[in-house]
Amino acid sequence: RKGDTRTNWMLKNQTELLDGTIYDLIFIGQDLAGNQTGFITTPDITYDITLPVFAILDPVNEAFVNYLTVSYEISEPLREGTITWTALNPVKDPESPRIISINREEMIEGVYTDVLLANMTNLIDSVTYNLEMKGADLATNEGIPSKVTSVHYDFSPPIITLTHPANNTYQAKTFLNYELSEDLLYGQVSWLQLYTRGVTPDTVILQGNELLAGLHDTTMFTAIVKLKDGASYDLIFDAYDLAKNEAVTGRISNVTYDFTPPEIELQYPATLAAVNNTNLSYFISEFLLEATATWTWVDGVLDMDDHIHPLEPFEREPGEKQFIMLTNAPDLVDGAYYDVTIYGNDRAGNPSNLATAKNVKYDVTSPVITITNPGPDVFITSTQTAYDLSED
């Protein structure tokens, strides 16, 4: 009718159009007097009733990532599109949800790999987000949203703290004390032998609980290597977290592993000997970090004192010591019997044997000999004598 306007009108005799086909729309009309309108044409109309398909390819569900880029695929050009990051814990990200509009050049049909969206904002470190991609094609058909859940964004490297062994120390055990600020995807510890050319480092790959965050005390690794007795090493700890952030390398320098206990041989005094001095002769196989010489009363004249005397550094040097008087010599009781013992630990803490001489008599009193027969000023007919001894 005159003056009528038809909006979104479906013609009664409309035929089925083919999806994805481009048409020209031609309108021909005639009034009641038979006057024709002529051709009214709207060219190049694309008939599209198929929903656009889009998918987030990366990151994937429950991924740990250290980047803001996304990879996605679009089946046809879009008129509008967004990707939304929603924090699972919105308290940690007050700006959540972060709705990022996709630019026109980012909405062309195809696959997009590692794209940093033009409108992308920074995300909060160590926060987990859900991602959702929405969009509508040029015909305003809205696609089914593509969702990715529980993506953990981690931009910080893990922190490795090494607490044992210390630099420049001797160790009798190969365990390691370390602390991790977060779970690791990969970690390795290498022992690099020092002062030796052409030696390949001995490396252990961390496994299972060894990769978990927290304190790891006296850890003997599952795949521990056999280190060389007496050799010195640098320890190198390399790792990266679940998002593949690389840690600053942890390093412990110049650790010498010593698995052999020191040997001490007490040469003087000997068991059951009688001596008039406190001198000692002994042999030590290696330098001792600490050592003592002990005289323990066992018999004879009573001695109530303890005689435990530390050896000075030069007295702990390896090799033989001949008849030396210790700097810290004991004050023994004349006529007493002692067990004499030297004992010590090497720089790695390995204990020595107990080098002992038993029942050693300490005697600084000169013996007294009394002749009872013959007496003075007498004539004798034989050479027989009689005498008394004050001691053996």
Residue spans of the language-model regions?
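Surface-exposed, proline-enriched loop/turn segments that connect beta strands in immunoglobulin-like
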Residues: 56-60, 162-166, 266-270, 371-375
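Flexible, low-complexity linkers/stalks enriched in Thr/Pro that connect modular domains
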Residues: 31, 41-52, 137, 147-161, ...
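Conserved structural position at the C-terminal beta-strand
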Residues: 27-29, 133-135, 237-239, 342-344
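Short, solvent-exposed loop/linker segments at the N-terminal edge
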Residues: 61-66, 167-172, 270-276, 376-381
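Solvent-exposed serine/threonine-rich low-complexity stretches and specific carbohydrate-binding patches
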Residues: 1, 94-109, 199-213, 304-318
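Signal that preferentially marks extracellular ectodomain short beta-strand elements
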Residues: 2-21, 32, 106-126, 138-139, ...
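A structural signal for beta-strand boundary/capping segments at domain termini and interdomain linkers
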Residues: 36-38, 142-144, 246-248, 351-353
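Solvent-exposed loop/turn segments flanking beta-strands in beta-repeat/beta-sandwich domains
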Residues: 74-96, 180-201, 284-305, 389-392
